Design a protein with these regions (language model features):
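Non-catalytic, structured segments within soluble enzyme domains
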Residues: 1-120, 257-272, 276-281, 295
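Glycine-rich, acidic and aromatic/proline-enriched surface loops and short helix-turn segments
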Residues: 5-12, 35-37, 41-42, 99, ...
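Soluble non-cytosolic domains of exported or imported proteins
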Residues: 10-14, 30-34, 48-55, 88, ...
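Acidic/histidine-enriched alpha-helical segments
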Residues: 54-57, 66-83, 138-146, 202-208, ...
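Soluble, non-transmembrane domains of envelope/secretory-pathway proteins that act on or interact
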Residues: 72-90, 206, 210, 224, ...
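Conserved catalytic neighborhood of penicillin-recognizing serine enzymes
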Residues: 86, 92, 96-99, 149, ...
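A penicillin-recognizing enzyme superfamily signal
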Residues: 112-135, 147, 156-158, 163-174, ...
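Short active-site loop at a secondary-structure junction
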Residues: 136-141, 164-185, 193, 197-205, ...
């Protein structure tokens, strides 16, 4: 067998399989009787003339009692040996999956969960989009499809791109900057903690946050500001400033903890390392991690490991987020009208069946993402360049989203998808906004968080300010005074309304002047009104 696999035929064709594909354009298992005789007759002397090979094959046919006649064999020899051979490229359907299943060097027959037809479709959809984006400096892409109920991986296209400079990189496992794909989990955490509701008003206005080495000044994708918007609009339209304000409420520490609970092991630094830019996806994550996190949203907040080995045991799931918050986030991500504030009504995220989806674009357009789910499937797509080169004017909406839509439409060509129903502890209430801030609508709330009446943005809200400490203040403890006796006064201007002090996300009190026992480290102090809106925030340091 080893000899047959190593023997050279007619130049650079080595082995029975190679010569079979080169001469007959098929694998050895698919050869007919006359073709097999001819191939066997090449072994003694592959460089013989077609006539000599045909004579050997005819003698072999006679000895073996073959039905193939000498004339048939001679005609076949003249045809296949008288023309240049051509070996078509053999495209592996899922080489990265094969390497995963055979990891450790064990040679075995392994069954995987992939759907072969779907895998081929996903690869073709990616190749088609990458060909269209080639003129915009886009060479690489990856896509992952999983079953929500079982966690089985149905398609694993880890590296698509004919012009890829890194064809062996697994794009599904490679960490890349997350962009806006983390926002659903941030808002979900704020809703779960009852800091905010889907109808809470957030300011989409210029923001400066003291940070080490200067000020952190986030901007929106289009560098414009919408003013007061609801959380539903802020998430659907992927606004950056409201997301940063929400992280100031939740705290980076709590958000990092939540992301790790969702399986994002790529976040291996302390929360201080990421800071408030984490709201905008400054951290690196993998497509594998993102898809499973979105699958958790689709599964009502329950997380479990994905499965590729068909022979492996089913994974148990564990609750990592409030089921009610997951449902509210799913409702927002499926809201076509709310999304239109940034993307318009007609875009690649609009489907004729129920889906919830989010795009993301990293800094300088080095990566873009589209991750979303239906009732049955979760699909994630990444488009970019493995070396990290920027794309030219390609966002998640124009890069990854069309592939996501193609895959979802293929999955649901004969399968319906319905929105999740209400669960215990969640209520649906009509809401209206004063001054036509947003159109009236019916909104989901965790029971007990629904607003008592019309939602308004009060002018006096803008006047509330933190007077002390000022941004970037450095407070030094007095070594001559016992630490337990030292106090710092937080001073605020409340402008006639009730406000609450929060330090690093923890409630302190609601008096205009509040005494606090200082603790060494960096802190963020926020002033929040009775509707959980952030009126002001400052960062300071205690040494």
């Amino acid at each position: 067998e080893a000899y047959l696999n190593l023997i050279t035929f007619r130049g650079e064709l080595q082995g029975i399989a190679a010569v079979s594909r080169g001469l007959f354009d098929k694998d050895p298992s698919g050869l007919g009787e006359a073709e097999s005789l001819l191939l066997a007759s090449l072994i003694p002397s592959s460089r013989s003339t077609a006539e000599a090979v045909a004579r050997r094959a005819a003698r072999l046919a006679e000895r073996t009692g073959s039905a193939s006649g000498a004339e048939e064999i001679a005609a076949l020899a003249a045809e296949v040996l008288g023309r240049p051979y051509r070996v078509r490229p053999q495209v592996a359907l899922a080489p990265h999956v094969a390497r995963m299943l055979l990891a450790g060097g064990e040679v075995r027959r392994a069954q995987c969960t992939l759907d072969g037809e779907l895998q081929a479709f996903v690869q073709e959809a990616l190749n088609r989009q990458l060909a269209q984006l080639a003129e915009r400096n886009v060479r690489d892409g990856a896509a992952l499809v999983v079953d929500n109920a079982t966690g089985e991986i149905l398609a694993y296209a880890a590296n698509q791109g004919i012009t890829s400079s890194a064809p062996h990189v697994d794009g599904i496992r490679a960490p890349r900057q997350a962009g806006s794909t983390l926002k659903p989990f941030l808002y979900g955490l704020a809703i779960e903690k009852r800091f905010l509701t889907a109808a809470s008003i957030l300011e989409d206005a210029p923001l400066q946050i003291p940070a080490e080495g200067g000020l952190y000044v986030p901007e929106n994708y289009d560098r414009e500001f919408l003013g007061p918007v609801s959380l539903r609009t802020a998430l659907s339209a992927s606004l950056n400033i409201p997301a940063v304000r929400t992280l100031m409420l939740v705290t980076p520490e709590a958000f990092v903890e939540r992301l790790r609970a969702l399986g994002m092991e790529s976040l291996d630094r302390e929360a201080d390392y990421y800071g408030y830019s984490l709201a905008l996806g400054s951290a690196d994550v993998t497509l594998y991690e993102l898809v499973n996190a979105y699958r958790t949203l689709a599964s009502g907040g329950r997380w479990g490991r994905l499965k590729i080995d068909a022979g492996g045991a089913a994974e148990n799931t564990v609750p990592v987020m409030d089921r009610r918050a997951a449902l509210i986030v799913s409702s927002i991500l499926s809201d076509r009208e709310a999304r239109s504030a940034t993307f318009g009504l007609e875009n690649p995220l609009a489907t004729r069946y129920w889906t919830a989806v989010k795009t993301g674009t990293s800094k300088d357009m080095r990566d873009n993402w589209c991750v979303g789910y239906s009732e049955r499937y979760t699909v994630g797509v990444w488009v970019g360049n493995f070396p990290g080169e920027p794309m030219w004017n390609v966002s998640g909406m124009s890069g990854a989203a069309p592939v996501w839509l193609d895959i979802m439409n293929h999955l649901h060509r004969r399968t319906a998808s319905r929105a999740p129903g209400a669960v215990a502890g969640i209520v649906s209430r009509p809401v209206s906004f004063r001054d036509s801030l947003e159109p009236p609508r019916t909104e989901w709330f965790i029971e007990g968080t629904e607003p008592p009446g019309e939602i308004a943005v009060e002018k006096r809200h803008a006047a509330a300010r933190i007077l002390y400490p000022q941004p970037a203040t450095v407070i030094t403890l007095d070594p001559d005074i016992p630490a337990e006796l030292q106090r710092v006064s937080f001073v605020g201007r409340f402008a006639g309304d009730t406000h609450e002090w929060r330090l690093d996300g923890l409630a302190l009190g609601s008096s205009a002047v509040l005494a606090w026992k200082p603790e060494r480290g960096r802190h963020v102090l926020t002033l929040v009104d009775r509707d959980n809106r952030v009126a002001d925030a400052v960062g300071f340091v205690v040494k």
